[in-house]
Structures are given as structure tokens and as C-alpha cells.
């Protein structure tokens, strides 16, 4: 948060003082360029190691600030008028809001060429189409995890909905995935971009299908899922994963590709979620995806070069080389990326689904929605999980529809600004 900026400022000040003592050294050396991002632990270490190598020959120093409270940190820095040069966010809704408020700088070439749907759709601003962010890494959703040898004809679902301030998002992933496979990319895209009512039959059906798939839970089981992290319980070596967590009598887990890090070395199986969701056959090759996108918040022209280097084939190669296999990043396109050492079976399966099997990729719907609506969606999922009665669902969807309409009215400046609508696309954009 602001403390991070203070510490960085002190480091820069001390470095400047030392330089001033050396004859011939300039006392006005440029500040480091700061990247604010969501990765901590081993992910953060790998990204920071790659970043430190990418500034070679630039005359600038790149530094990384990683936090799990990314939104709160960025909001605090913007309020203090001390934004990072570059921030990496996973929410198109938040990025869209920052662009609307004039906080982002349009991307320069050649970075703009690496930004394509569904990860980085263009925005209409002041009558011009502009690109404000580029995907650095992506995650494939629409996946189901289980132990090898476990029958899949009658799965018992592991559910952990807790995630600190964003609790509920694992449930929104379920509903989004079900709607995508039942209704198809068209209705999904309209719903994600606030052009479809929350009372629409396709939306209602997705919620009720989720309740049916998870039916038969005891009050104790419901409370356990509401209070347990999506990473599962914690052991001496860290999160165990829901499939390995004591007290969870379950066989299958619906979760994004990133969860592979908690199952590293386990006898694990991953497969597409389509056949579990009571969807249509024609939608089986549609997949939900997420991403971490870089945007420029600074007028410093070197910040544009920083993002260009991060999103380049060389930047990807360096990042991938620094990462442990369990947290090795996935990229939105492999063109220009030199081959690396063979991946394990799970990575090979995920890579094949993302780059070969998938015909349509749709960005995570809640991450496209405006933050107010997304947060309300999270809360509604938690309430519905506790009480899935039809009458309760109708009340929750009415509340979400009211928020959708209100947010649209509050941001009714379509003549000068239009949020993205193309959040489903083929693998190549």
C-alpha cells in the first residue's frame, strides 16, 4: 500500500545520496520504474527475477511490488497521486473504469499488436478505438480436477468459497461456466457486458443447475465450504488443495488451471468441465479464461517500453525460465515463443486445451463486470449457497438486476466512452 511507496522512496533517496558522494556521478538519476502486481510467493519471485533481467540496456531499473490486496493498494496509490508506472490487473471491469476516468495511457506499438480479444478488447474513447492493456499471462478455466482412477460418472464436488475480501468468486466461476455451456457464447457475452437481464431464463437456469449439481449437502457441509479457502486447508507445506483436505468427502473440483500449484507432484487428472455441466454439445469446445493484464498509469515514455518488453517473446521466455514448473505461466499466444523443456502431463493437457481444443474463449464474466456489480455477484453467490430456495434466488437476481441498471445509468456516457463488448473470441483473437 502507501507504505510500499514510502519504502521505495527511501531506497531511491539513499541511492541518490550515495551517488552524490561519488565524483562524476549524477545526483538526478531517474527513479526506478515500478510494476504493481498480484503475484506473491514463488510466482512473485519468478516474475521479479525476470523483471530484473529485462531492464538490461535501458538505462532504467525495473522493480516489482506484489500484493494480494491489489485493488486496495492501487486505489490508495491513485488517491495519493503516487500511482505505479505499470499495474497488472485481472479485471477488465476495473481496467475499463480506470480508462474511463483517464488514469490509463493508450498502448504504443508494437505492444498494441499483442493485445487481442478476449483478453484485451479495444475501447471506444472520444470517438476513437484505443487499446489500454495487454495480457501478460492467462489462465484456462472450465476445468475439473480429480485424482487419477476416480470414477467421474457420479462426482461429489469439493467446494471452498472463502477468499478474504473476494470470497464467493469460486461460485461465480461455476455459474459463468454453466451459462456458457448451456446458453452459448452469444448470451454469455451479452450477460457479461450488462446487455442481458439477470432475470433472463438462461441466467436463472445457470443458478438452478449449480444448486442441483451440489444438492444434498448438510448444514455442516455448507458452512465448511463457506469458511474454507478455495486452496483447501493448510498443512506444514502450505495449502493442500480441496481434494487433499481433511474433512472434505469429495472426488472432483471445479477450478482454474492456476490451482495446479497445490497439486504439484500429485497423481492428479484434469479434464474439460463441459460434460459435467448439462450443457449443449455445440458448446463443448467453449472455454472460460482469465488473465493478468498490464496497463500503463504513468506518462513516463519508458513505462511503454517496459510493457513492450514484458509482453515480448523474450520477456515470456525469461519469465518462464525463472518459474518453477508448478507456477510456470501460460501465455495467450505461443507465436514467437521458443520451445521449452517438456511440461508434465497436467501442463501438456492444459496447453493442448488452450491452444488446440478450444474453439471459443470467453473472458471470466464477473471480471468483465463493473466492480460494484462484480462484488454484488460475489455476495449473492454466498447467500445462494447457504439458501438455494427458488424464492430466495428470485430476490437475489432482482437485486443484481437493480444494480446492473443503476451502474449503466451512472456511466451513461456512450457517446464519448463505450466499454468492451467482444469478450469471446477464437484462440488467436
Listing of model-derived features with the role each one plays in the protein:
Residues 134-135, 152-202:
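Extracytoplasmic/periplasmic solute-binding protein
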Residues 353-429:
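Conserved C-terminal helix/tail region of periplasmic/extracytoplasmic solute-binding proteins
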Residues 264-330:
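Extracytoplasmic/periplasmic substrate-recognition and gating elements
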Residues 21-24:
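C-terminal motif of bacterial Sec signal peptides marking the signal peptidase cleavage site
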Residues 26-28:
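Bacterial signal peptide processing site
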Residues 92-142:
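Hinge/lid segment of periplasmic solute-binding proteins
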Residues 31-96, 100, 110-113, 117, ...:
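Early extracytoplasmic/lumenal segment of secretory-pathway proteins
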Residues 192-234:
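Glycine-centered hinge/linker elements that transmit conformational signals in sensory
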Amino acid at each position: 500500500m502507501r507504505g510500499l511507496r514510502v519504502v521505495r522512496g527511501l531506497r531511491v533517496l539513499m541511492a541518490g545520496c550515495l551517488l552524490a558522494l561519488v565524483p562524476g556521478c549524477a545526483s538526478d538519476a531517474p527513479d526506478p520504474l515500478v510494476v504493481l502486481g498480484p503475484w506473491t510467493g514463488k510466482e512473485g519471485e519468478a516474475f521479479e527475477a525476470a523483471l530484473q533481467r529485462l531492464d538490461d540496456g535501458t538505462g532504467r531499473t525495473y522493480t516489482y511490488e506484489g500484493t494480494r490486496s491489489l485493488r486496495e493498494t492501487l486505489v490508495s496509490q491513485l488517491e495519493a497521486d503516487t500511482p505505479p508506472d505499470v499495474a497488472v490487473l485481472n479485471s477488465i471491469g476495473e481496467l475499463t473504469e480506470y480508462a474511463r476516468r483517464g488514469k490509463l495511457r493508450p498502448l504504443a506499438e508494437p505492444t498494441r499488436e499483442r493485445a487481442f480479444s478476449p483478453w484485451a478488447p479495444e475501447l471506444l474513447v472520444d470517438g476513437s478505438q484505443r487499446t489500454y492493456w495487454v495480457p501478460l499471462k492467462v489462465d484456462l478455466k472450465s476445468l475439473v480436477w480429480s485424482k487419477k482412477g476416480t470414477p467421474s460418472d457420479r462426482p461429489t464436488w469439493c467446494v471452498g468459497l472463502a477468499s478474504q475480501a473476494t470470497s464467493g468468486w469460486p461460485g461465480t466461476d461455476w455459474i459463468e461456466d454453466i451459462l456458457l455451456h448451456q446458453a452459448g457464447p452469444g448470451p454469455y457475452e451479452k450477460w457479461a457486458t450488462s446487455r442481458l437481464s439477470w432475470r433472463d431464463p438462461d441466467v436463472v437456469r445457470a443458478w438452478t443447475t449449480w444448486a442441483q449439481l451440489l444438492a444434498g449437502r448438510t448444514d455442516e457441509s455448507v458452512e465448511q465450504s463457506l469458511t474454507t479457502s478455495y486452496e483447501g486447508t493448510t498443512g506444514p507445506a502450505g495449502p493442500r488443495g480441496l481434494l487433499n483436505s481433511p474433512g472434505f468427502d469429495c472426488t472432483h473440483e471445479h477450478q482454474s488451471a492456476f490451482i495446479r500449484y497445490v497439486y504439484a507432484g500429485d497423481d492428479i487428472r484434469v479434464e474439460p468441465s463441459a460434460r459435467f455441466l448439462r450443457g449443449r454439445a455445440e458448446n463443448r469446445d467453449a472455454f472460460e479464461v482469465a488473465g493478468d493484464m498490464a496497463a500503463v498509469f504513468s506518462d513516463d515514455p519508458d513505462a511503454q517500453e517496459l510493457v513492450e518488453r514484458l509482453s515480448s517473446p523474450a520477456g515470456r521466455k525469461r519469465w518462464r525460465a525463472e518459474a518453477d514448473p508448478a507456477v510456470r505461466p501460460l501465455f495467450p499466444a505461443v507465436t514467437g515463443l521458443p520451445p521449452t523443456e517438456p511440461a508434465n502431463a497436467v501442463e501438456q493437457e492444459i496447453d493442448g486445451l488452450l491452444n488446440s481444443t478450444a474453439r471459443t474463449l470467453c473472458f471470466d464474466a464477473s471480471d468483465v463486470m463493473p466492480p460494484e456489480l462484480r462484488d454484488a455477484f460475489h455476495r449473492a453467490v454466498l447467500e445462494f449457497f447457504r439458501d438455494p430456495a427458488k424464492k430466495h434466488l428470485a430476490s437475489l437476481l432482482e437485486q443484481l438486476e437493480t444494480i446492473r441498471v443503476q451502474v449503466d445509468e451512472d456511466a451513461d456516457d456512450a457517446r464519448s466512452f463505450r466499454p468492451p463488448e467482444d469478450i469471446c473470441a477464437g484462440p488467436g483473437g
